[in-house]
Amino acid sequence: NMKKALGGGYVAYLVVAVLLAVITGIWSEMGVVQLVIWVIFSAFAAIASELIVGISAMYSGWFPGFATALIFLIVGMLIGFPSLPLGILVAYTSATGPAFSDMAYDLKCGYILRGCGQDQELELEGRKQQYISEIIGFIVAFILVAIMAKQYFSQGLFAPVDATFAATI
């Protein structure tokens, strides 16, 4: 059920946005009204980025992820978010769309490899296995980033997009 899946995704993004808002809001001493606006905006930005990038990246590559993150950066600046919450917002929104696109590619490929849904039982089992594989991939990626991030960034290895975001701010 698409409506249930998107609704569940939005709730999950909202929960993460609330957690990020509380942490960054307390850290940067945001006012209550600004904090509430940030929570709502970041949840909207995440779901919008997920849909825009997820759908368009299947046809036009990774550029939409950069473009939507830049748009949310500019809108966040116009709203007046402090730099720390704004940086978190941009990172948050830029992560949601490409993740959705990757999952769409994975599911589409699996669907084709399993015979385009001709065997319903095989299709459901295949989706379950893909889901488990993606969770394992997420856990491995999380651990590697936690271990290697400090070493990576201490060498000045930043994605080229950081210069655009920094120049915009």
Role assignments for model-derived ranges:
Residues 1-169:
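Alpha-helical multipass membrane-protein architecture
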